Every structure is written in C-alpha cells, then in structure tokens.
C-alpha cells in the first residue's frame, strides 16, 4: 500500500460514542494523518455510557460533549469515528453523513438491513467516504490474497474459514437453577467490559454470527475478489454459554455459502470457552484452487512467551508484525484523499449483514435461503 502524504494537514476527527471497544478511535489517533478533536454522545444516554465516553476523553485530553448536534456544529472536523452499541451504529453514522463528514465505523454495520440501507443512501447523497472496521490487513490475510491473486493455486474453487474465539461469556450453559431468572443481556455485557468480551453490548441480544461474522465473511469477500454470496444454509445453537441460551442467540454456527462465479464457501464460528483452546482460538483459512490448495493460520506470525509466575489466564501466544489497525487508518486517509477505496465499504458490509440475516433465517427454517444483496 502506498502511504498518504505526511506533509498534508492532519484530518480532525470527532469520536461519536466510544462505549464498546475503543480499538477503533485508538487506531485513528495513532496515525499521523489524524487528530482526535472531541468525544460526543447524547445526554439522554445511560450513565454507564457517559462514564466510558468521559474516561476515553480524559485519557486523550479532549472534551466530552453531551450533545451530538452541538459538537458537530461548533467544531470544524473532517471525519468521525463511530463506536457505540451496534444497534446505534447507523443512527450516529447517518448524522455524520448528513453533516458531510467521512466515517470510519465499528463492526457490525448494523443488525438491520433497513438501517444499513438508510446509511448507504445518506453516504451516497452526501458523497462521503465510509470504512467499516475489519481484519483484512492481517499478515496472514495479505499472504492468502497474494496466493490467490498470483494464481499460485490456480483458479479459486472453494474456501472455508474456522473462526473460533476461545473466550468465556459468563456462566456455562446448564449452570442455572430451576428458579433462576434468565440472564439479562445488557447486564452481562457490562460485566464483560473488563476483559473485552463485550462485543455484543446493547439492549438487543446478539449471537456470534451477528457480532463476529463480519470478520470471516469479509475475508471471504476479499479473497473472492468481491464476489457476492448468493445463497446460504446454516445451523446455529446456544451450546456453551447460559447468557446466549437465555437470550435465544447463537454461540456456535456453521454456514455453507454459494458464491458468485461458481465458488463454494463455508465458515464455522463460535465463542467456545477459554478452556477449549490453548491460544485465543482456532482461526484458519482453507483455500482450494484448480492447481493446488493452502491452509493459512490467521494468527501467524506469532511467538510464544513463558515466564515465572505468569498469570494463568494470560495468553501465551502473541501475534507479531500485525499492522492491521494502522493499515486500516492508512486506507481511510487515502480514501478521504481520493487515492484509494475503503478495503471494506458500507455496501460490502451491508451485504455481509444480509448474509448473516439470511443465515439466521436459514437456521430457523432448516432450509437454504437466498441473500438479499444490494
């Protein structure tokens, strides 16, 4: 990737809520082409959201403004970083688009296709750029894409992605007693913030397909050259965690994909518990071409670290040479400059949302379902 012009004035960025993970605005702040200007959210939000927003603002020594319209009207900025609860992603991004601001937004784009379409219409109407956060610049994904683009394994025929996170999500399934109330989804997500396993934070319960499915589906979208998933067949289950079971969402799923150009694909995804794997989880690509095949571990390159009195829950394996977040920020800057296109734009992320929704419908119906692509 060519670098952006470091001589240009940095873009000023407003942070529209940072109540889930803060990796997105941190990555933007770490890039020399961006400066964070403020954090903002609506004053009507619950207290826990204000506490998280204020904490981030204090760390970066920028103001926290409890009024989005006021923040946008009184501060001259070029772009926004959007990282609230997933159910609010599109609401905040539409406000930014209508203000003529470029957008980098956390995943998933939304849990509703109508919200995705509303955002896309606003982006196209106001001619702004939108990058949806992803992991497509991991070293292993770059290597996999190079193997396909170079025709080293011939024409791409089929690919599979294992995407298992070996993380806990509260009490294990079967641990509740007969008179116990169902676990409240939001309460559980608030508890999970300390260890970063609250990707599904919000009022609406979200299964692993909705929370993390964008990652493997974005891999597949990139590796197939942007081909659309046309039809899916899926199985989903609450297999590991009581909170998922109580809220009728999946923590384990398999999806078979029929993709444009006669390509077949599949993915297996789950939040499978910390005891299930010595590393963060089994995340692997299996790619079959007309002249050969390859298996690529998403975590590589990595090193293993062991030392005396090491905390038992500390991951022993550490990824190295991982510039994914920096390269995403670089891609965003180049896209604003008009020198590049987002590696995952809002239409592609919307179609991934459509694939997830079709998969959930397929699991409910027990039959293949067509994907409603845009």
Language-model features: locations:
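Hydrophobic residues in well-ordered beta-strands that form the structural core
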Residues: 66, 105, 130-132, 160, ...
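Beta-loop-alpha module in the N-terminal Rossmann-like domain of NAD(P)-dependent dehydrogenases
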Residues: 60-122
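Rossmann-fold dehydrogenase core element
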Residues: 118-135, 155-159
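Contiguous beta-strand/loop segments that form the cofactor/metal-binding neighborhood of enzyme cores
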Residues: 6-7, 211-300, 327-338
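Predominantly a Rossmann-like dinucleotide-binding segment in NAD(P)-dependent oxidoreductases
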Residues: 19, 138-245, 366
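C-terminal glycine/acidic-rich active-site capping loop/insertion
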Residues: 31, 62, 186-190, 275-277, ...
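C-terminal helix-rich "cap/oligomerization" subdomain common to oxidoreductases
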Residues: 1-7, 79-81, 117, 333-374
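N-terminal Rossmann-like dinucleotide-binding module
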Residues: 1-59
